[in-house]
Amino acid sequence: MEINFKVLSKPIRGSFPSFSPKVSSGASRNKICFPSQHSTGLKFGSQERSWDISSTPKSRVRKDERMKHSSAISAVLTDDNSTMAPLEEDVKTENIGLLNLDPTLEPYLDHFRHRMKRYVDQKMLIEKYEGPLEEFAQGYLKFGFNREDGCIVYREWAPAAQEDEVIGDFNGWNGSNHMMEKDQFGVWSIRIPDVDSKPVIPHNSRVKFRFKHGNGVWVDRIPAWIKYATADATKFAAPYDGVYWDPPPSERYHFKYPRPPKPRAPRIYEAHVGMSSSEPRVNSYREFADDVLPRIKANNYNTVQLMAIMEHSYYGSFGYHVTNFFAVSSRYGNPEDLKYLIDKAHSLGLQVLVDVVHSHASNNVTDGLNGFDIGQGSQESYFHAGERGYHKLWDSRLFNYANWEVLRFLLSNLRWWLEEYNFDGFRFDGITSMLYVHHGINMGFTGNYNEYFSEATDVDAVVYLMLANNLIHKIFPDATVIAEDVSGMPGLGRPVSEGGIGFDYRLAMAIPDKWIDYLKNKNDEDWSMKEVTSSLTNRRYTEKCIAYAESHDQSIVGDKTIAFLLMDKEMYSGMSCLTDASPVVDRGIALHKMIHFFTMALGGEGYLNFMGNEFGHPEWIDFPREGNNWSYDKCRRQWNLADSEHLRYKFMNAFDRAMNSLDEKFSFLASGKQIVSSMDDDNKVVVFERGDLVFVFNFHPKNTYEGYKVGCDLPGKYRVALDSDAWEFGGHGRTGHDVDHFTSPEGIPGVPETNFNGRQIPSKCCLLREHVWLITELMNACQKLKITRQTFVVSYYQQPISRRVTRNLKIRYLQISVTLTNACQKLKFTRQTFLVSYYQQPILRRVTRKLKDSLSTNIST
């Protein structure tokens, strides 16, 4: 079958350059075949390079024979007029495996070679002077407060300071007896011996770092590596203080449960601990663990993504203006409480990711990292000097990723969260700001490759992200690392070894924009199935995506959730099950289910939902602030709405649970098979296959179709596996579930095109049908193909592995008899377990030879 590809004439804002298919027509259906994992992309933009690699500044490491592994090593940047050393010839083209996947990147080979060389050189320098990257990323064992040989040792990098001392409750905030010494790398240190075998600084006591400016002014700052910071809750807008956290063994939390296995496809529940209470107050880590985690598990999510964990002095920043990078947010509890939460999640089989903000830092001076910037140059600061060090839209500071101590600080920060708290991975926030020197400000990315690989690329930041992903996966190979990038930079989600940046997943950020646009600006009759489907499939298929219809971004004040866009004020009065649903509520609930399921099923290789949106939480999020009289009323989750038996919120919650259960059962998100067979703008119907499931969506506001035939790839018998119109999901029960549907061959002779009679497809409804596997003359097929049954199964389910198993052969030998489902029901286990036990015998003794023989011979005509 001929496959034609095209580039969207008007790329979606923020969308990924993609392999965008054109439909090729057949006699009985249209079928879209997406490129396989090893397919290449299309050419975007000009082939000419418009950048000069020699303009990128490089870093030089100051060498000294007295350098020791335990000492701090400071990187000194050259000025912006410095030139880059010539590229060495040993960086070969074949080392950039990314170009083999996408040959249209070939014109940018020099760029990839340059950044790969920078990455290799930086890593080699670290290993030369500090040891392996994993040891370099243990800076928290040296910097900040640590116990060493009967002493408390405190170290701080502050090369521009003139004099330093440590102050706190332990010395009455008078540091004259605790002055610090500075080494040649700008690291200040002090050793405070124990007195009577007890630490001089008590556990849970306040501490700060006091230093003198070059102009003679003394200032107090929270230590950069502090592990806990608190503010006086009895005072309004009280400043934060660092806290020395070293609990005795009896007060430490000890993890009891191992990390759960990495899921084949993450189904992520994005959550904010503080606003997770049903009451208008700040919730705690332990309350979240005991009350909210069971809800997440009950809805069959396998991953929790926690926002706002790193300490941030301004609650309303949603946690994205971090002040203390190694400290847990004290609003919700202390470090041991967070460990309890993570351990509880692991006991439920849930992975836990943390939002990590390394793209910028809070502009706060008294309680943030910005307080260490006293006007010095980039060589002596965590941030770029001058205008380059400020993000004018976010009002925040920007890291200098070429600085040695910045690399130590940020890489150590990642290892700290992984090892101290047992997190299972990260979501890197706002990395578009990191990838480009313009930070994405006033940029509308169109997909032209010149936008990604030019002098606008911040290679220092790219190298840091490559180092970060290399480190994370070395420490914890099963970590899940997700990138939030609106630009769609190619290679972001490919391994570092291929020349990529190394993330496991990227967020599909264009999808929610499309839904919001449709809900705000288009009537139901004007929805384009082709346009919506293109938005969901417009991605690089060699890089995995996390799809979502809405996240916390769509929930904040000034915006509206999908449920609120659909039902608005009727959510206050029309959600009772004791009265008939109004047309607005009926439409709203139906489309809420369809939009989220459509996004999940077709939009990526993982799925994300923000806390409360699964049941259509009304209204918006508004953190306490002066403008709302510091109210917490809109900064909570009303779980009682989903729990109430007489409110319609329960229907959306039940459907969300069923969506996730479906992937748990069939693993369609992890399937490489994705075929869109129909995008009917007139009838408002979309039909596609994911794995061995057939999805049918009818977005028409009125039309119900009788005897509607849809295309499918596999012949045989199908039955309904999920129906959004079912009574238990608040629907009208217009589709029967007790009827099996058999395919019938249609189309061009010799081409195995099949259809099954969909009988009825109600309006505003989505149906999912599963293929009922039948055990046929599989042995005969294997004998004719001269392959083993195991080879046949592998080649069939993970196509294409064996080219001998052609589609025609599969169709011919899978005209089947006894249903696998019936067999599983008799044996009382899942189909996957049956396949494993049947084809790799003997694994389960319950599957006896007699039973297998009876199944194989029970052939129905």
UniProtKB/Swiss-Prot annotation:
One of its GO terms (biological process) is carbohydrate metabolic process. The active site is at residues 429, 484. Its main location: plastid. (1,4-alpha-D-glucosyl)n binds at residues 173, 208. It is found in: Plastid, Chloroplast; Plastid, Amyloplast. Pathway: Glycan biosynthesis; starch biosynthesis. Keywords: Amyloplast, Chloroplast, Glycosyltransferase, Plastid, Starch biosynthesis, Transferase. The record marks 553 as: Transition state stabilizer. It catalyses: Transfers a segment of a (1->4)-alpha-D-glucan chain to a primary hydroxy group in a similar glucan chain. Its EC number is 2.4.1.18. Disulfide bonds: none annotated. CDD domains: AmyAc_bac_euk_BE, E_set_GBE_euk_N. InterPro entries: A-amylase/branching_C, Branching_enzy, Glyco_hydro_13_cat_dom, Glyco_hydro_13_N, Glyco_hydro_b, Glycoside_hydrolase_SF, Ig-like_fold, Ig_E-set. PANTHER family: 1,4-ALPHA-GLUCAN-BRANCHING ENZYME, 1,4-ALPHA-GLUCAN-BRANCHING ENZYME, CHLOROPLASTIC_AMYLOPLASTIC. Catalyzes the formation of the alpha-1,6-glucosidic linkages in starch by scission of a 1,4-alpha-linked oligosaccharide from growing alpha-1,4-glucan chains and the subsequent attachment of the oligosaccharide to the alpha-1,6 position. Belongs to the glycosyl hydrolase 13 family. GlgB subfamily. Monomer. This is 1,4-alpha-glucan-branching enzyme. It comes from Solanum tuberosum. The lineage of its organism: Eukaryota, Viridiplantae, Streptophyta, Embryophyta, Tracheophyta. The gene is SBE1.
